[in-house]
Swiss-Prot record:
GO terms for molecular function: oxidoreductase activity, acting on NAD(P)H, quinone or similar compound as acceptor; quinone binding. It comes from Synechococcus sp. (strain JA-2-3B'a(2-13)). This is NAD(P)H-quinone oxidoreductase subunit O. Belongs to the complex I NdhO subunit family. The keyword Repeat does not apply. The lineage of its organism: Bacteria, Bacillati, Cyanobacteriota, Cyanophyceae, Synechococcales. The gene is ndhO.
């Protein structure tokens, strides 16, 4: 199934850590990125803009292959 706006996703640690996207930002990736669901709020090509968690945090752009759709 294709990921679309509103889809809940979770980051895949093995694909995100050490990636170009991770190197372009703070090297410490907070656990909430891997442990909480994120909502896809925009899509541009192979990249997804994702809002993680219920607390106010900035959105992040990740490649579609760095996340997995959550069941449910």
């Amino acid at each position: 199934m294709a990921i679309k706006r509103g889809t809940l996703v979770r980051a895949i640690r093995e694909k995100l850590e050490g990636s170009l996207e991770a190197q372009a930002s703070d090297p410490f990736i907070p656990n909430y990125v891997f442990e909480t669901p994120g909502e896809v709020v925009d899509i541009k090509g192979d990249y997804l803009q994702i809002k993680f968690g219920a607390v106010p945090t900035p959105t992040v752009w990740l490649r579609a292959d760095q996340v997995q759709e959550m069941a449910g």
